[in-house]
Amino acid sequence: MTPNDAKRPLQLNDQGRLRHFLSLDGLSRELLTEILDTADSFLEVGTRAVKKVPLLRGRTVCNVFFENSTRTRTTFEMAAQRLSADVITLNVSTSSTSKGETLFDTLRNLEAMAADMFVIRHADSGAAHFIAEHVCPDVAVINGGDGRHAHPTQGMLDMLTIRRHKGGFENLSVAIVGDILHSRVARSDMLALRALGCPDIRVIGPKTLLPMGLEQYGVRVFHDLDEGLRDVDVVIMLRLQRERMQGGLLPSQGEFYRLYGLSTARLARARPDAIVMHPGPINRGVEIESAVADGAQSVILNQVTYGIAVRMAVLSMAMSGQTAQRQLNSESEEQI
């Protein structure tokens, strides 16, 4: 390792381009904007009769999910396939890790099979970072969610959703509501919104579900949902992550819905053109009313669509020396 290697962020290569994608912390507005611009270009691929481009032909992407997932795992698979990569999805319950093999040894064996990229989801915060520190130099690592720490591709698909529906971030008020304490999505969203210039970021929830140190994110904290929703442009609802909770944080789900559930009446306190988002899975009647989740202001299904494009952008940028945007343009020109 050279002195420059020691100083350079693990996520970036010598040219300041993506090498791994582990967290949004410390990434520049320019790089985040490039990811969004590239994802915008890939949205067009999803409208084609043949939804494929050859950018990662001959490359192998391994999805290694140690936590259950539907949207994230499936959209990463679709993203890699649309880029023409070969995709391996490791079923952890039937893999050698269930027989006592360590995560490190499992990944070393997959590396020996010439995998080019790992998409990792793990219950432990920092797991993806640990793996990125120990893989071969030519292998990329993408964080598909690690503990409470980060979910960077979810953060970016949320930003793409906001940008496509609101045009930008400079004049927006965004409210993030619910279980902030256990949410890696909330952390990634707050980092991205701040980096992209959103002037008013609000977090709303009971004191027992708000972490210490929120001031470092430049947010305003509300404990009253009605007050916090006043005149916001974007509402991001979060589910109660009861699997990560210890007892005593909430009196009941019913009480939580009474105080912090998003109903049609409560949504009326936001701007008339406000959009409603949710990373899923939705708990109807716990954090959000069905009439809101399925209503005209909901863009929840759009988030899923945009997630494929964002993950295509991240996969291609992390595995490429040039911008994916430039590659996509070149590929399109060759077809003309």
UniProtKB/Swiss-Prot annotation:
Q: Which UniProt keywords apply?
A: Pyrimidine biosynthesis, Transferase
Has the keyword Transferase been applied to this entry? Answer: yes
Q: List the disulfide bonds.
A: none
Protein's organism: Azotobacter vinelandii (strain DJ / ATCC BAA-1303)
Protein name as catalogued: Aspartate carbamoyltransferase catalytic subunit
What the entry lists under InterPro entries is as follows: Asp/Orn_carbamoyltranf_P-bd, Asp/Orn_carbamoylTrfase, Asp/Orn_carbamoylTrfase_sf, Asp_carbamoyltransf, Asp_carbamoyltransf_Asp/Orn-bd
Biological process terms from the Gene Ontology for this record are: 'de novo' pyrimidine nucleobase biosynthetic process; 'de novo' UMP biosynthetic process; amino acid metabolic process
Record-annotated residues binding L-aspartate?
A: 99, 184, 239
Which Pfam family, an example, fits this chain?
OTCace_N
Summarize the subunit comment.
Answer: Heterododecamer (2C3:3R2) of six catalytic PyrB chains organized as two trimers (C3), and six regulatory PyrI chains organized as three dimers (R2).
The free-text function statement in the UniProt record for this protein reads: Catalyzes the condensation of carbamoyl phosphate and aspartate to form carbamoyl aspartate and inorganic phosphate, the committed step in the de novo pyrimidine nucleotide biosynthesis pathway.
